[in-house]
Amino acid sequence: MSEPAGDVRQNPCGSKACRRLFGPVDSEQLSRDCDALMAGCIQEARERWNFDFVTETPLEGDFAWERVRGLGLPKLYLPTGPRRGRDELGGGRRPGTSPALLQGTAEEDHVDLSLSCTLVPRSGEQAEGSPGGPGDSQGRKRRQTSMTDFYHSKRRLIFSKRKP
């Protein structure tokens, strides 16, 4: 079942498997479709939440938006450095934090999200398994669960008419 030497196809993507099932991709049409879909989603969210997510301003409507004090953004989310506000992909502008939202935040409002981890060696007494300790169940193997562990098995009763 080998193909003849003249019918060998060249893989256009090199060694990777690559198929175009529906023809070439029109990138301009794709970007227009994505932009239209995004605009529709933004408009739907704007009408639902009475908030303009593009300019980050509240709108008149069912909801009354107010600033929550003391919940400032962590430093992780604030833009820093010479590439401030630049997208890593393509160099376009990415949405930054609005000055209206950051107004009134101070250094003490930021939450410190740093964590530290230290390894603690086990002592010989705990490794042997003290009663009630975490090493108590290490020696036993767990059996594999089956369907009957979750559902009780029942016998099906079949009533048939007896012949006279």
Curated annotation (Swiss-Prot):
Residues 153-164 have a biased composition (Basic residues). GO terms for molecular function: cyclin binding; cyclin-dependent protein kinase activating kinase activity; cyclin-dependent protein serine/threonine kinase inhibitor activity; molecular function activator activity; molecular function inhibitor activity; protein kinase binding; protein kinase inhibitor activity; protein sequestering activity. Induction: Activated by p53/TP53, mezerein (antileukemic compound) and IFNB1. Repressed by HDAC1. The modification Phosphoserine is found at S114, S130, S146, S160. GO terms for biological process: cellular response to amino acid starvation; cellular response to cell-matrix adhesion; cellular response to gamma radiation; cellular response to ionizing radiation; cellular response to UV-B; cellular senescence; DNA damage response; DNA damage response, signal transduction by p53 class mediator. Disulfide bonds: none annotated. A motif (Nuclear localization signal) lies at residues 141-156. One of its GO terms (cellular component) is PCNA-p21 complex. Phosphorylation of Thr-145 by Akt or of Ser-146 by PKC impairs binding to PCNA. Phosphorylation at Ser-114 by GSK3-beta enhances ubiquitination by the DCX(DTL) complex. Phosphorylation of Thr-145 by PIM2 enhances CDKN1A stability and inhibits cell proliferation. Phosphorylation of Thr-145 by PIM1 results in the relocation of CDKN1A to the cytoplasm and enhanced CDKN1A protein stability. UV radiation-induced phosphorylation at Thr-80 by LKB1 and at Ser-146 by NUAK1 leads to its degradation. Residues 76-164 are annotated as: Disordered. Residues 53-58 are annotated as: Required for binding CDKs. The PIP-box K+4 motif mediates both the interaction with PCNA and the recruitment of the DCX(DTL) complex: while the PIP-box interacts with PCNA, the presence of the K+4 submotif, recruits the DCX(DTL) complex, leading to its ubiquitination. This is Cyclin-dependent kinase inhibitor 1. It comes from Homo sapiens (Human). The gene is CDKN1A.
